[in-house]
Amino acid sequence: MVVIRAPLKELEGRYGREIVDLILRYSSIIGYSVDHDEELKIEFNPDRPDLFSFPTLMKQIKIFFYGEVEIRKPQIRDDAVKVTVSKGVRDIRPYFSALIAEGSSIGVHFDELINYQEILHASIGKDRSKMAIGIHDLEKTGDSIHYTTVSRNQRMQTYDGMEGTVDWIIKNHEKGIAYGRLLPGTGRSVAITDNEGNILSLPPIVNSYRSRIDEGTKKFFVDITGTDLNSVKFAHHLMSNFFSSLKYRIRTPSIDGLPSRETEIIRAFDFRIMRPARRSIERYLGEKMDSEETITHLRRMGYVAEPGYPEIAVYVPGYRVDVMGEADIIEDILKSKGIENIEEKQIFIGKFGEPLFMNKVKDLARDTMIGLGFQEVMTFVLSPASYLQEYTGGVRIQNPKSEDYSVIRDKIYPDLLDLIARNKKHSLPQRIFEIGDKIVGGKQRTALSCVIADTRSEFSTAKSYMQGFLARFTSENPVIVPQMIYGSIDGRSGSIKIGEKIIGVIGEIHPAFLERFSLAVPVSFFEIDLDEIFIANMDHLGL
């Protein structure tokens, strides 16, 4: 969750006495919590970073309630300000973008700017590892700026007056101690410098005193560096939106040394076009909506929209980094209309429901495992890629919110090992199982996986439980084909075969694999593909 707060009287002075009423009304549309007394506190879900400051939030509120539609124009390139990117940065923090914002003195919005910068560092930037933002007073930097590498022996003065070499700053400044791990331990460091080689900032750590901003700054230069192009792209448009919310004029400098593909990806993200089908909108909403009403709702939510048939042309602002497809746009139409204004309809079903065959199979497998003395558990379908070094699922999450949930699992037993590790305080033996989904070779499969953690757990332990389980479902005897199974001891693992079909795997977990979960107790396991075994034995099951 993301929290912003400010004294209520200050906000009323900036935005008017109706600010609390407007924010409360808008909260029922977007979905965030508000507390207010002497201080106004708002707690957001992490999916709308464009709202994480009072200026940007109030901009969207005015668009929604007052129709103050922003006529967005492409960012004009300012050839008077030139940025040169050196090749040396490509091995450290390769991605770069920049913008210029010019207007009246930042004044009372200074703290909001700094807070928004830090919120983006924590959320979009993943604590500065993927992206970091530097904000400078352009009137102090000159019009020629360089993104380059510098010697760790070069001296600089930080924004708060600490002076020393780059190496000393990294090791002793509070920001260096916190973020120095993001730079190589030796060699040169990346830096933003002026034309004379003076350091303006040391991404992703600290800005210099030379280009320090204050309440009187009118002309800003914003640099965005990172290790992830999407994060840099998102931050560019979010920072542009912050300044445009304060009526600043936004331009981009002339940048030399970057691949044109990267700059085009960042530029094209603003007002990218999506074309939701009218039929899809009606299907999701459950009722017909004419073109004029649809366009009205889209404009209230900050889009530029043009009528059309069978599709509507929707231009998505760059700061709406949460919009990934037509479902997100239709969700915004629903928010604008209000779910309470959707007519309720009775659903008529022509027959009584009954369990799917596979659900009957799962129930039978569940009852059998409980009868064998196992306890059922449920773990996440998303797993960390670090669990699955031999990953065969073929489905990875793009831009995961956490590296702990970066792939859709292709095997279940590593998740069960993690669960055992989190419950080491409980007495042994621990016998648990899960019936769940996984992806193998891009196809979804349903599997039963179980682990036995005990001081005497070994390959034969898992084998006896596996035979007891399969005896309930097939008259054929399973055969174990010796094979090295991921995470298992070679010679104590294999594939489970019935007839000509491989239906699963079995093994005793290798001590080195157990150490990754901080487990000292022996563990054995088996994992069976329910789709394979039960389709082949439907007659024997009697379901």
From Swiss-Prot:
GO CC annotation: phenylalanine-tRNA ligase complex
A molecular function GO annotation: ATP binding
Keywords: Aminoacyl-tRNA synthetase, ATP-binding, Cytoplasm, Ligase, Magnesium, Metal-binding, Nucleotide-binding, Protein biosynthesis
Reaction(s) this enzyme catalyzes, per UniProt: tRNA(Phe) + L-phenylalanine + ATP = L-phenylalanyl-tRNA(Phe) + AMP + diphosphate + H(+)
EC number(s) stated in the UniProt entry for this protein: 6.1.1.20
Name of a matching Pfam family: B5
SUPFAM superfamilies: Class II aaRS and biotin synthetases, Putative DNA-binding domain
Family: Belongs to the phenylalanyl-tRNA synthetase beta subunit family. Type 2 subfamily.
PANTHER family xref list: PHENYLALANINE--TRNA LIGASE BETA SUBUNIT, PHENYLALANYL-TRNA SYNTHETASE BETA CHAIN AND LEUCINE-RICH REPEAT-CONTAINING PROTEIN 47
Protein name: Phenylalanine--tRNA ligase beta subunit
Organism: Thermoplasma acidophilum (strain ATCC 25905 / DSM 1728 / JCM 9062 / NBRC 15155 / AMRC-C165)
Gene: pheT
